[in-house]
Amino acid sequence: MAEAITIARPYAVAVYRLAKEKNALADWSQMLALAAAIAADEQMRAFIDNPKVDAADLERVFLSVSGDRLNEAGTNLIKLLVEYGRLSILPEIAAAFEALKAQDEGVLEAEITAAVQPSDAEFSAIVKRLEAKFGKKVEASVKVDPEIIGGIKIVVGDTVIDASVRGQLQELAYTLKG
């Protein structure tokens, strides 16, 4: 996965620069989300990974599935990715594009992991505290994981705030080992 994102990043940067130059960030977000969803489909993934399928057939099928929802530049991106055997990294390109867009807009992505689903009020309070801490708008998603036992774990970029019971128990065990 790390290799795929490394390969995808230059494509995402190039597309982001083009989209920003043409004032078409929203259009590109939609096109990349669509293309990523198509590329991530189980049947399409098998088709993409099949060495017996030639590039022309892959390009034709992929573009026919996307219909008229890609503009000329989007179609050219698909053709380029097919030509260089990179169509399978479309989900990573889309994710990197969205990360660049969020960074440029001053928005931070946060993933909140909780043992139980937080209420709307709790979720709003967490987001407000994160926005105050980082001084930026925060878009958060919640993942429920009973394995953390209680509390929450928050990941914002490279920052991890582990206020989970499991994390505290692991820290205690580490401290006791000396």
Curated annotation (Swiss-Prot):
Subunit structure: F-type ATPases have 2 components, F(1) - the catalytic core - and F(0) - the membrane proton channel. F(1) has five subunits: alpha(3), beta(3), gamma(1), delta(1), epsilon(1). F(0) has three main subunits: a(1), b(2) and c(10-14). The alpha and beta chains form an alternating ring which encloses part of the gamma chain. F(1) is attached to F(0) by a central stalk formed by the gamma and epsilon chains, while a peripheral stalk is formed by the delta and b chains.
Keyword line: ATP synthesis, Cell inner membrane, Cell membrane, CF(1), Hydrogen ion transport, Ion transport, Membrane, Transport
Locations listed in the record: Cell inner membrane
Main location: membrane
Protein name per UniProt: ATP synthase subunit delta
Taxonomy of the source species: Bacteria, Pseudomonadati, Pseudomonadota, Betaproteobacteria, Nitrosomonadales
Membrane topology recorded in Swiss-Prot or TrEMBL: Peripheral membrane protein
Role of this protein: F(1)F(0) ATP synthase produces ATP from ADP in the presence of a proton or sodium gradient. F-type ATPases consist of two structural domains, F(1) containing the extramembraneous catalytic core and F(0) containing the membrane proton channel, linked together by a central stalk and a peripheral stalk. During catalysis, ATP synthesis in the catalytic domain of F(1) is coupled via a rotary mechanism of the central stalk subunits to proton translocation.
Leader sequence segment: none
Annotated GO CC locations: plasma membrane; proton-transporting ATP synthase complex
